C-alpha cells in the first residue's frame, strides 16, 4: 500500500469518525433536554403530592365527635 493510499484511508476513517462523533453529540444533547424536562415534571409531581398529603393530613388532627 502506497503512502498516498494510506493517507486517503486515514482521511476517510477520520471523516467517518467525525460524523459518528457529531451524531453521538447530537444524541447526548437531545437526551439532556429530555432529562431536564423529566426532572421538571418530577419536581411538579412531588409538589402536587406534598400538597395533597398536606390537605389530607390536616383532617386527621381534628378531635373525634363527642359521642365517641
Swiss-Prot record:
Pfam families (UniProt xref): SlyX
InterPro entries the UniProt entry points to: SlyX (IPR007236)
The family this protein is said to belong to: Belongs to the SlyX family.
HAMAP family referenced in this protein's UniProt entry, alphabetically: SlyX (MF_00715)
Name of this chain's protein: Protein SlyX homolog
Lineage of the species this protein comes from: Bacteria, Pseudomonadati, Pseudomonadota, Gammaproteobacteria, Pseudomonadales
Gene: slyX
Amino acid at each position: 500500500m502506497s503512502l498516498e493510499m494510506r493517507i486517503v484511508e486515514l482521511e476517510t476513517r477520520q471523516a467517518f469518525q467525525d460524523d459518528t462523533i457529531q451524531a453521538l453529540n447530537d444524541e447526548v444533547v437531545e437526551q439532556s433536554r429530555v432529562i431536564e424536562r423529566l426532572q421538571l415534571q418530577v419536581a411538579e409531581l412531588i409538589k402536587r403530592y406534598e400538597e395533597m398529603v398536606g390537605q389530607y393530613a390536616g383532617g386527621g388532627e381534628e378531635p373525634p365527635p363527642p359521642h365517641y
